[in-house]
Amino acid sequence: MLGQYYYHEILRKTIIAFGTIFNDIHIRHRDGAGKETSDMRVPLAYGPMQKFLARLEQQPDLNRAVQITLPRMSFETTNIAYDATRKGGITQTFKASDGSKLRKVFMPVPYNVGFELNILVKLNDDALQIVEQILPYFQPSFNVTVDLVNVIGEKRDIPIVLDNISFQDDYEGDFATRRALIYTLNFTAKTYLFGPVSDSSEGLIKKVQVDYYASVDTENARRELRYSATPLSLIHI
């Protein structure tokens, strides 16, 4: 049974959709008079937090251009797990038409994809600005629309649930040591995985016709009335 190639890019699309949520967050700095002095878009990259911490430790000279390294955000996938609470019928098939033929695929399988979003900053106020722009949208979930299977036009709203928030201050050493405050937000994306899509042997219904007769003898009786209908989608093809 295994070995039939197919690739809907569902996990990849889910990762991209998650990152898109946080790719336009800004922080602003003000002087003592309350005048805005800077507006910075926070960089976002896919990768583990340890990668960025190692770079800060190995290249302390980057402190001369703080905006290049901090603040910044990173995210990564932490786990993929089956979600039995959203389980549907196993033997049912999902059917869709592209206008010329009918396609079918078995009902999707629910999976949860875990994400970790790390916010690395030098100043705690920067972290608070970023976190406050994120939290109000998650109550505790935020829906994103993902085109799961292009060939059948299957789009679904994927809830992304905020699970928990943690904080740590990775500052150890003397005053010359680079400080990094880290806020970690854990999320769960409730997505669906589809199997291979195949052509349905049932064919596409292009026209429906119903005849009414005045007698049960349909061969000899005169037809009294005929109704016919063409699906709206076929009229516009």
Which residues are covered by each model-predicted region?
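Small/polar-rich, solvent-exposed N-terminal microdomains that initiate assembly or binding
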Residues: 1-92
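Membrane-lipid interaction segments
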Residues: 41-50, 57, 83, 94-107, ...
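Oligomerization/assembly interface segments of phage tail-like spikes and tubes
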Residues: 71-79, 107-123, 132-134, 179-192
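Short conserved micro-motifs at the rims of enzyme active sites and ligand-binding pockets
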Residues: 84-88, 195-201
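Acidic-leaning, charged glycine-interspersed low-complexity segments
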Residues: 107-109, 129, 138-197, 204, ...
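Conserved small/polar residues in nucleotide/adenosyl-binding loops
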Residues: 235-237
